[in-house]
Amino acid sequence: MTVDYTQFCPVARTLDIVGDRWTILILRDLIIEGPRKFQDLQRAFPRMSPNTLSTRLKTLEEHGIVERRTYADHPPRADYVLTDKGRELRPVLRTLRVWGEKHTKPPSPQRA
């Protein structure tokens, strides 16, 4: 689902890019784990459909946040890595983590 805020607000414009469900978690995974193959990301988010993962990665690529690197191996392989622009989001995710630690509760053991 693409949302178009068409506003002058930079927060709204940023949400156009990273505000879809799963996108921040994909970025978090790339920040923590470094370059990842599509299959690695699928395993990290088993409840996300492959189509959704593909769409989110393409959006991040289109905006220069993630780069898809391909290798001439047999079989061919590719991985996804943050660009400089993507790495600039590290402090944003760090701030979200700190806020979450302060203001949210972890799930109870039976819900985890």
Task: Give the predicted meaning of each segment.
Residues F8-S49:
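N-terminal helix-turn-helix DNA-binding core of bacterial DNA-binding proteins
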Residues D4, T14-I17, D29, G64-E67, ...:
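Short, contiguous, well-ordered secondary-structure segments
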Residues R90-A112:
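Amphipathic alpha-helical dimerization/coiled-coil segments
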Residues Q39-Y71, P75:
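Canonical helix-turn-helix DNA-binding module
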Residues G19, A72-T95:
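Basic, amphipathic "hinge/linker" alpha-helix immediately C-terminal to the N-terminal HTH DNA-binding motif
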Residues M1-Q7:
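N-terminal intrinsically disordered/low-complexity leader segments
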